[in-house]
Regions:
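Positively charged, amphipathic and often flexible ligand-engagement surfaces
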Residues: 1-487
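Generic beta-strand/beta-sheet core signal
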Residues: 147-149, 180-183, 230-234, 263-265, ...
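Conserved short loop/turn motifs at secondary-structure junctions
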Residues: 148-155, 232-237, 262-268, 352-353, ...
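Terminal low-complexity tails and localization/encapsulation signals of metabolic enzymes
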Residues: 406-562, 566, 573, 577-588, ...
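Rossmann-like NAD(P) dinucleotide-binding subdomain of oxidoreductase/dehydrogenase enzymes
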Residues: 602, 630-766
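ALDH superfamily catalytic-core signature
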Residues: 697, 719-720, 724, 731-841
Length: 841
């Protein structure tokens, strides 16, 4: 048999027409009306916006009066949707006119109607409703891939609840196929916690597989079979980990003869490699006497989220850049997946509503004789006439079926909103399928879309754009007049996880090494002082000395000030263009020493790797920003730029890299000499990044780094030679400096207490995620940490909100930063009288 068989465009188009005609025979009057509603909505973006916002806000706002006013506002803003029938349009107009005043009547009716109208898409999990639905589909010989919707998993308690929910569902005689998400059964998975979370996830997936075996179902032929579990792919960040988990569990001897499935997303360039890995695994498994497995091929549904995350982090988008490429990759994966030698070991679920993709898969399977290894999979409640037509044509069909209990229905609305948004996107097949007819512009658009994908499928590259490797030398960025942010580290990549392990190997001291002695810098000279500050590893019970740093006395401080004032190296005489070049070089060197800066922050201040990483990115941005911005000012008419003299930068310990770098670059960019006095407890970090500036071309006389005692610090802050002081620190420190030296300009960013306000209209689940991140990020040691939560009464009295907030907070992993899975590291010191006083209130 020719393994390179490809259906021709004519064959595909002929079969699409056959499938379309069958669909037309099966579609009901109610379904045609529903299709017409969608067709109208697609033509009127304001109708879609209204519906999406109303659905979303109805799921978030618990207060009837507030929700009633909000729906009225949406109607005023977007108008009554035209896709509504006459009765519903009239009711909305009456609501807009006066009904919103009767919220106690209107809102329960709206929510009940919402549940009723979505009952075909989101199935009620309560019995006997679910029993009836599953029995109907079983009689129709339509498979049901049950997706259990519920509360958002924010902590361990909810994850445990969802996990046991899956186990209970598998005991139900009429549920024989479920989809499981890692995020639904375990709350603490993140890139640097994979190794620690892996055994627990193996245990949980094993228990689910065993439950599927222990509670078999009886098929239509009276044969008992193990239930099927499909492992869903979610965000790109967990894709490789999910595949690894899937293989590891099925490799256990007790599951040798158990068949399970996993999703592969065609919009990822990695999908081809995922399929390759699955094929190799499946062939070895079957050759060893084991059962085949299944790949559920989808196009992908997290495009917007992946795009936003990539943009925020400065990473390449992991998604293929066009819909045509995604469709082409889908066809490519179908071609390989349906070859006999592949399909027999790796069964294929073709998950698509696209008639052309379906036709292509059907023709391939017919040619290869692999239809018995393939199922067509669609969404329950979406274009039901399509799956009926498939069934009529003899194809096996499985419907992805979200189910939810009544008390969690509003949590399921987000699923509904996402599906509706996807299915009405401009280039989505379903957008053009409503009222679809041959020889129309919609039909021609879809046919052309397929033809373009067909032409492209053999010319795709299958290389992920996410190739960042922190183990390699940094690629320098040339000086530019356009500012671009430095990307954070992509810890999802295995090579960067290895990089973290190398950082730990270097910076986690054993205590047997001689601690480094950091000298005192006085201009271009250094001297080791008898008076030194010892730095102990907070994560090793303060028992391991990392280094010692020399402290300046008053006389040495005066010498340092003199050097800065006289500027013997002539930094003030440099041109802005020269400084711009040097600052870019410093930025490159900072980026190249990212690992050491992170390691130093971990060891000295107890900052976690992820928190240290974003700080380095910010420091690199600062190094590029100030001269880039200053060049724009210099280009303005009537603007003269000249140095002020010597700038004193006093920086804090909680952001020991980004904040001091920002201060010194602000001074250096203007041609000023800078004295940096970092917080003593974090000073080794400053000593390290100062080397980047010196090596880049900043004279040591122009940038001096010191730590001092209290008496010498007063000499520094009151010296007439200091022309400007930049302080980030406590309010009392700023006040003391201002009192002691009211003449020198002081730019002070001082402490504060951050308040997060959550209204009754807010998304409480997302609020909890952000509250916890704000309150406990950097161990809460920052003025921007959420110290007070201000909520409306209805939120305050919401016991579910309180429970979920507590669950999310208490589930955070706390401990040594040398365990990369920990989210919260140690406090900088145990001697915090104010904090201890607060605990005792």
């Amino acid at each position: 048999m020719d393994k390179q068989y490809q259906p021709t465009l004519t064959e595909v188009q002929d079969w699409v027409l056959k499938l379309y005609n069958t669909c037309e025979q099966t579609i009901t009057k109610a379904e045609r009306l529903e299709q017409h509603k969608y067709a109208v909505m697609v033509q009127r973006p304001q109708d879609k916006k209204f519906l999406v916002k109303m659905l979303d806000e109805s799921s978030q706002i618990r207060d009837r009066k507030i929700l009633a006013k909000r729906i009225k506002t949406l109607l005023d803003q977007y108008g009554v949707p035209e896709f509504l029938n006459k009765r519903d349009a009239f009711l909305f107009k009456m609501y807009q006119a006066f009904g919103h005043h009767f919220d106690f009547i209107a809102i329960p009716i709206i929510k009940k109607r919402l549940r009723m109208d979505t009952s075909q898409v989101i199935i009620n999990e309560e019995r006997p409703q679910l029993t009836k639905h599953l029995a109907t589909r079983f009689k129709e010989k339509i498979g049901q891939n049950v997706n259990l919707l519920g509360e958002v998993v924010l902590g361990n308690e909810e994850a445990d609840h969802r996990y046991h929910h899956y186990l209970e569902a598998l005991e139900s005689p009429d549920i024989n196929y479920i989809s499981v998400k890692i995020s639904g059964i375990y709350a603490q998975t993140h890139a640097l916690n994979y190794e620690e979370s892996f055994p627990e996830l193996v245990s949980r997936m094993s228990a689910l597989y065993q439950k599927a075996i222990d509670f078999p179902y009886t098929d239509e032929d009276g044969i008992k079979r193990s239930k099927f579990i499909n492992l869903d792919m979610e965000e790109y960040k967990d894709a490789h980990f999910t595949l690894r988990l899937f293989k590891a569990v099925l490799n256990l001897p007790q599951f040798k003869n158990y068949s399970a499935g996993i999703v592969v997303q065609a919009y990822l360039p990695d999908a081809y490699d995922f399929q390759t890995e699955l094929l190799e695994f499946a062939k070895a498994r079957v050759d060893g006497g084991g059962a085949p497995i299944k790949m559920r091929l989808v196009k992908g549904c997290n495009l917007e989220m992946e795009t936003v995350i990539s943009s925020l982090k400065g990473w390449p988008n992991p998604i293929r850049p066009s819909k045509t490429e995604v469709d082409a990759n889908y066809l490519c994966l179908l071609e390989r997946g349906l070859m006999p030698e592949n399909a027999r070991v790796l069964h294929l679920g073709v998950a698509s509503h696209n008639l052309f993709s379906i036709a292509y898969a059907y023709l391939l399977a017919q040619k290869y004789g692999t239809t018995g290894y393939m199922t067509f999979e669609m969404l329950e409640g979406m274009a039901n006439h399509l799956w009926r037509a498939q069934s009529m044509l003899g194809n096996r069909v499985i419907l992805y079926t979200p189910v939810v209990k009544n008390e969690h229905f509003l949590n399921a609305v987000s699923y509904l909103v996402r599906r509706m948004d996807e299915n009405t996107a401009p280039d989505n097949f379903l957008t053009h399928s409503f009222n679809l007819k041959p020889d129309t512009k919609e039909w021609d658009f879809l046919a052309k879309q397929f033809e373009e994908a067909y032409a492209m499928k053999d010319h795709l590259t299958h290389v992920s754009p996410r190739v960042q490797n922190r183990n390699l030398p940094y690629t320098p960025v040339a000086p530019s007049d356009t500012m671009q942010n430095e990307p954070d580290t992509d810890f999802d990549l295995s090579q960067n996880q290895e990089w973290v392990r190398r950082i730990f190997a270097k910076w986690k001291k054993s205590g047997t090494e001689e601690p480094e002695i950091i000298p005192l810098q006085i201009g271009a000279e250094t001297v080791v002082c008898k008076n030194r500050y010892k730095y102990l590893d907070r994560c090793q019970n303060d028992e391991v000395c990392i280094c010692e740093m020399s402290q300046a006395d008053s006389a040495q401080v005066e010498k340092i000030i003199e050097i800065a004032e006289t500027d013997p190296a002539g930094w003030r005489k440099t041109t802005l263009e020269e400084r711009h070049r040097i600052m870019y070089e410093a930025a490159n060197r900072l980026a190249d020493m990212r690992g050491d800066l992170i390691g130093c922050m971990c060891a000295v201040t107890g900052k976690t790797v992820i928190e240290g990483d974003v700080e380095v990115s910010e420091a690199v941005d600062y190094a590029r920003f100030y001269t880039t911005a200053m060049k724009k000012f210099a280009a303005l008419d009537d603007i003269e730029i000249k140095p002020k003299g010597t700038i004193l930068v006093i920086s804090p310990w909680n952001f020991p890299c980004a904040i001091p770098v920002g201060g010194i670059v602000a001074g250096l960019a203007g041609g000023n000499t800078v004295i940096l006095k970092p917080a003593t407890v974090a000073a080794p970090v400053a000593w390290m990044f100062a080397k980047a500036f010196w090596d880049a071309g900043v004279p040591k006389e122009a940038l001096q780094v010191i730590i001092t005692n209290r008496e010498a610090l007063k000499v520094l802050t009151t010296a007439p030679a200091i022309k400007h002081i930049i302080l980030t620190g406590g309010t009392d420190t700023a006040q003391n400096i201002a009192r002691a030296n009211p003449v020198t300009p002081l730019s002070a960013e001082t402490g504060g207490k951050n308040v997060i306000i959550l209204t009754a209209s807010g998304d409480r689940d997302h609020a909890i995620m952000n509250i916890v991140a704000s309150a406990f990020g950097n161990a809460g040691q920052k003025c921007s940490a959420c110290s007070l939560l201000l909520v409306e009464r209805s939120v305050y009295e919401d016991k579910n909100f309180q429970s979920k907030l507590k669950d999310a907070a208490t589930s955070l992993k706390v401990g040594s930063v040398w365990n990369p899975g920990n989210i919260v590291g140690p406090m900088i010191t145990n001697k915090n009288d104010k904090l201890l006083q607060a605990f005792n209130l």
